[in-house]
């Protein structure tokens, strides 16, 4: 079963890399980013984490995915306020909402920290 799930992970990673916005974020609607054009940091954090983890574990080629990870990480760091608050986090709900820079949730911060832990490991290589 391991190889089966690894193949799914690689396919999902490739698709997600192609859906990254020009601004570095993944938006609330992956297939129609214009419907929710504002940044979305919780998804971006989780995706950056997943891709960086794959690079660190040797599952994903760094030459292909490192530029995507760096662009996503740069986007995430732009969303951190001077007081440390992470903004642009989609609220819990049944469907996407328009978000603003001052909107945050704990899981957004968690996603940021998970991404940071893998970025740190990348920087150590």
Protein language model features and the residues they cover:
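Oxyanion-binding "anion nests"
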Residues: 1-31
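CBM-like carbohydrate-recognition segments
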Residues: 38-125
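Short linear capping/connector segments at secondary-structure termini
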Residues: 26-34, 90-95
């Amino acid at each position: 079963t391991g190889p089966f799930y690894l193949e799914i992970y690689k396919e999902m990673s490739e698709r997600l890399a192609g859906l990254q916005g020009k601004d570095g974020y993944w938006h609330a609607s992956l297939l129609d980013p214009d419907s929710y054009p504002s940044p979305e940091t919780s998804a971006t954090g989780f995706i950056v984490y997943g891709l960086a983890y794959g690079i660190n574990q040797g599952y994903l080629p760094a030459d292909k995915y490192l530029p995507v990870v760096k662009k996503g990480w740069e986007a995430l760091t732009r969303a951190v306020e001077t007081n440390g608050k992470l903004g642009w986090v989609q609220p819990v709900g049944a469907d996407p909402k328009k978000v603003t820079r001052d909107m945050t949730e704990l899981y957004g911060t968690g996603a940021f920290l998970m991404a940071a832990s893998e970025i740190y490991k990348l920087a150590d290589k």
